[in-house]
From Swiss-Prot:
Keywords: Cell cycle, Cell division, Cell inner membrane, Cell membrane, Cell shape, Cell wall biogenesis/degradation, Glycosyltransferase, Membrane, Peptidoglycan synthesis, Transferase. It is found in: Cell inner membrane. Pathway: Cell wall biogenesis; peptidoglycan biosynthesis. Its main location: membrane. GO terms for biological process: carbohydrate metabolic process; cell division; cell wall organization; lipid glycosylation; peptidoglycan biosynthetic process; regulation of cell shape. Its EC number is 2.4.1.227. This is UDP-N-acetylglucosamine--N-acetylmuramyl-(pentapeptide) pyrophosphoryl-undecaprenol N-acetylglucosamine transferase. It holds the Pfam family Glyco_transf_28. It catalyses: di-trans,octa-cis-undecaprenyl diphospho-N-acetyl-alpha-D-muramoyl-L-alanyl-D-glutamyl-meso-2,6-diaminopimeloyl-D-alanyl-D-alanine + UDP-N-acetyl-alpha-D-glucosamine = di-trans,octa-cis-undecaprenyl diphospho-[N-acetyl-alpha-D-glucosaminyl-(1->4)]-N-acetyl-alpha-D-muramoyl-L-alanyl-D-glutamyl-meso-2,6-diaminopimeloyl-D-alanyl-D-alanine + UDP + H(+). Belongs to the glycosyltransferase 28 family. MurG subfamily. It comes from Klebsiella pneumoniae subsp. pneumoniae (strain ATCC 700721 / MGH 78578). The keyword Nucleotide-binding does not apply.
Amino acid sequence: MSGQEKRLMVMAGGTGGHVFPGLAVAHHLMDQGWQVRWLGTADRMEADLVPKNGIEIDFIRISGLRGKGIKAQLLAPVRIFNAWRQARAIMKRFQPDVVLGMGGYVSGPGGLAAWSLGIPVVLHEQNGIAGLTNKWLAKIAKKVMQAFPGAFPHADVVGNPVRTDVLALPLPGQRLVGRQGPIRVLVVGGSQGARVLNQTMPQVAAKLGATVTIWHQSGKGGQQTVQQAYAAAGQPQHKVTEFIDDMAAAYAWADVVVCRSGALTVSEIAAAGLPALFVPFQHKDRQQYWNALPLEKAGAAKILEQPEFTVEAVASTLASWDRETLLDMAERARGASIPDATERVAEEVSAVALAR
């Protein structure tokens, strides 16, 4: 089968942690001549982001069931059936050789539709704990991959596909050797920010004084409040931005990152070769804790769960990391990364399509 004849449908939606890895794999296969379409929902980020990346997208109507009332739970089978019918019609038109599920609600009915049409399903789990949809789909998938060990007992560990500009950063030894002056602390709470970071880090800055310089990404609507908090702590010199458009440049600037531990963030930090202080979001299944654990075990990071993320604990942790320690941690982070994750996922997709 030549590259021009191969067709892939990517199923991913909801959050950047699902969509960005899917885009990385899609672009890699498109460069090899594959035709790629996307299955998503019209009210989430993929609706805008995927077409901007030159990929046509089809929509089905589906949403999550967690935390919904009894009426929504009772209607769920009807909604899933309708979404399955929509996905099935889309796949009948496009006739993909293989579908790739990268997570999000859309993968459930999409994967079932593909299976019902005899189209092989390939799954990639980005988190250290498998999501509900992928747990179901794993039973019918031809191939299951995972970014971190432990999500599935026998799945190949292939890492998370990350952006090429992050992979292109100089290695820690080239980037960090010879740096002087205050330790550069990058604080990242995601696009929505993280209240615990926004409230705690200005006080940490006051404790550490001139030994650190901070670049703090506050999240949407948080810039002024966080700037005022730094000023009130007597630390107005630190940089606060609502968003960071060029994360690769921010990683290149930083000596250490203080952040949540979403799957993509953890994978990017490892690929960049950066030490980290992680404060996992308190999911019921502790998903972000399990994402961060491999880097802590590798000696590249420390995890402080949210109740432990106090001014004193954060300040003492950062103060204990001198430049020599940070360089060692950075090299351990890079050593724990899987920089060819995109290629690994793409190769498995190709193998399943060829074996069909």
